[in-house]
């Protein structure tokens, strides 16, 4: 279960001071996780039909409701998606449902969402996450072979695939955190651009039960990053990672009007 919001702030403050930006704030409940061993990354037959109806009648309507009525998401920069059929998409991880913020911002494009394997969970929420396009990583080699095949399959068929390069979710944390290289490895491996996104917050004027002000969202879609022909694979991974992170740092400073301090 999520920790109380004030407790979350204290944990974030502590981890920030220690420079441990990829640590999880909420405890991970492995008891509700389902093994990825039998996860179908590419849905077929009756499962594909089931997922279609779940996505059409539950996931999509809730995505619209959440973004229009609850967090009142504004999307900036959708013109950068023009002409980009397949891509790796990155975003800061700041909200339990920020994958739905990404879905809303990227509407009109098919989106798959990478996730830690413990997110493949039991119950209704797990069902909806799978219907919404979740692709869990795995600690097992054989499962990652299937994951990698699915990556290739979807990118060849005009899909976007979302990565959270910060790894852990920090609730309503406004600063960009250091990026891992996984997303950029796949962009270089499959020859697709990276579309950087960054979520910022605006005040709602509403106070929640913890005495904290609720936030409204702005999703910034930024200019795609392409690999450079003159660089080898390793160099391009690092170039794209650094470029993406710097773009998010610049967006933070532009939006909030203050220098980034970590």
Task: Please place each PLM-identified region on the residue numbering.
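Catalytic core of membrane glycerolipid acyltransferases/transacylases, capturing the structured
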Residues: 83-141
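A generic secondary-structure micro-motif detector
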Residues: 52, 114-115, 140, 172-174
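Non-catalytic C-terminal accessory region of glycerolipid acyltransferases
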Residues: 1-25, 148-262
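A conditional alpha-helix N-cap/helix-loop micro-motif detector
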Residues: 71, 140-144, 176-177
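Short, charge-rich binding segments
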Residues: 80-83, 104-105, 152-156
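Short amphipathic alpha-helical segments and helix-helix/interface helices
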Residues: 63, 102-103, 126, 151, ...
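Membrane-anchoring hydrophobic helices of lipid-metabolizing enzymes
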Residues: 1-88, 97-101
């Amino acid at each position: 279960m999520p920790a109380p919001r004030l407790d979350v702030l204290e944990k974030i403050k502590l981890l920030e001071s220690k420079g441990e930006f990829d640590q999880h704030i909420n405890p991970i409940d492995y008891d509700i996780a389902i093994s990825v061993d039998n996860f179908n990354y590419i849905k077929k037959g009756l499962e594909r039909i089931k997922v279609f109806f779940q996505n059409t009648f539950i996931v999509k309507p809730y995505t619209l409701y959440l973004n229009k009525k609850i967090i009142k998401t504004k999307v900036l920069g959708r013109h950068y998606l023009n002409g980009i059929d397949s891509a790796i998409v990155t975003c800061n991880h700041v909200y339990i449902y920020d994958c739905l913020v990404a879905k809303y911002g990227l509407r009109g494009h098919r989106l798959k969402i990478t996730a830690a394997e413990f997110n493949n969970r039991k119950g209704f929420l797990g069902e909806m996450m799978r219907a919404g396009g979740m692709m869990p990583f795995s600690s097992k080699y054989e499962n990652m072979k299937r994951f990698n095949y699915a990556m290739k399959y979807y990118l060849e068929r005009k899909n976007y695939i979302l990565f959270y390069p910060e790894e852990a979710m920090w609730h309503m944390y406004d600063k960009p955190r250091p990026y891992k290289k996984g997303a950029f490895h796949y962009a270089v491996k499959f020859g697709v651009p990276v579309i950087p996104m960054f979520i910022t917050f605006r005040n709602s004027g509403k106070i929640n039960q913890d005495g904290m002000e609720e936030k409204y969202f702005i999703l910034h879609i930024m200019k795609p990053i392409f690999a450079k022909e003159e660089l080898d694979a390793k160099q391009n991974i690092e170039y794209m990672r650094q470029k993406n992170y710097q773009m998010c740092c610049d967006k933070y400073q532009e939006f909030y009007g203050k220098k980034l301090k970590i």
